[in-house]
């Protein structure tokens, strides 16, 4: 299964904003603050 994790840049450690099963949901959250957030795709078993 593929999941998308949205991170937000922080001072010392990047924070996880959320983990999503659908890419569209992750992109929606990312667009709220596109300069401060990024998405990573991960395969989980």
Report the location of each language-model feature.
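Short aromatic-glycine-(Arg/Gly/Cys) micro-motifs in beta-strand/loop hairpins
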Residues: 1-16, 25
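Short, mixed-charge low-complexity intrinsically disordered segments
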Residues: 10, 14-15, 31-45
